[in-house]
């Protein structure tokens, strides 16, 4: 901290050594160029030193805050490859890449519209039929569970014993449960050719 304060004091001493110190009002004015803070005498001294060395004057931009010898970089600007990948990805969605709408005659458009609507109607009927079958299966399982809950036995067991045993699922996922050959069978909408192999042994 002390070295920073010393360097600032030395800089202020060199700036205000050649002329009068600026007034506080001049320092508070907004949008003041950087050359206003330098005394005019320092600028004249630097210009005279360049003239004594055989030069016409200080380099351009010395008093305007521009770095001496700074040049604009030439050549193409380097672009981040990640930006290029993003632009290529979204270029497919550009309006220039979207194909124009189909232009049909009146009769051909009517045929196209009829086939399209018929296909949508067929898919909706299939979806509703599948949902109806699933709803019936769920209702059947619910009725079976309700029947087990109201059933007595076996033997002297109390009412609902079979329902509790069915909901506990003890031994279903063990070695003595359903054979893996049947448990891993792919679920299909139609029954298999052989529903159960009674002669199978582990």
UniProtKB/Swiss-Prot annotation:
Q: Which InterPro entries match?
A: Ribosomal_mL40_fung
| Chain spans, region Disordered | 42-79
As for subcellular location, the record says: Mitochondrion
Keyword Ribonucleoprotein on this protein?
A: yes
Name the Gene Ontology biological process terms. Answer: mitochondrial translation
Give disulfide pairs as residue numbers.
none
Q: Name one GO molecular function term.
A: structural constituent of ribosome
Name the PANTHER family on file.
Answer: 54S RIBOSOMAL PROTEIN L28, MITOCHONDRIAL, LARGE RIBOSOMAL SUBUNIT PROTEIN ML40
Q: Which family does it belong to?
A: Belongs to the mitochondrion-specific ribosomal protein mL40 family.
- Name of protein: Large ribosomal subunit protein mL40
- Species the sequence originates in: Neurospora crassa (strain ATCC 24698 / 74-OR23-1A / CBS 708.71 / DSM 1257 / FGSC 987)
